[in-house]
Regions:
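Conserved, structured core segments of small domains
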Residues: 1-132
């Protein structure tokens, strides 16, 4: 079963609180994520993973009745959290996906304290939902 694990990060001053961390704190966080991803890859569980650009670089695109789509800034600046990155994992049970998400959530933050970031876990559909 494939699951998408979506890491939600808190906003800080500006886009992302991590931008206010000390260099050694940011380095420890990146090293944790690198080691975490390598372990998932070595176990054969990692399908893909990516970090995402800052919310200020995001755009919302909608179809219009005209030829060109409407492109606006987004997501909303008043949001307290934003999608910072994701993993797609292939595991045998939901519990395995939850365990992986729990480890990701504990990535170190300021002072080395675990961030306890919210990680949303959703199964990737293998086909369309059943229709009665």
């Amino acid at each position: 079963m494939r699951y998408m694990l979506m890491m939600h990060a808190p906003r800080g001053n500006g886009d992302w609180a991590v931008m206010n961390w000390k260099p050694e704190e940011l380095k420890a966080h990146i090293e944790f994520m690198t080691t975490f991803n390598k372990a998932l890859k070595a176990s054969g569980q990692l399908v893909g993973a990516e970090g995402l650009a800052m919310p200020s670089d995001a755009r919302i695109v909608r179809a219009t009745s005209g030829a060109a789509p409407a492109v606006t800034d987004g997501p909303y600046p008043e949001a307290k959290e934003f999608l910072a990155g994701y993993w797609i994992v292939d595991v045998g049970s939901p519990e395995e996906a939850y365990e992986i998400a729990g480890r990701a959530s504990a990535a170190p933050g300021p002072g080395g304290t675990p961030l306890n970031m919210p990680i949303e876990v959703r199964q990737v559909m293998s086909g369309p939902p059943p229709v009665d």
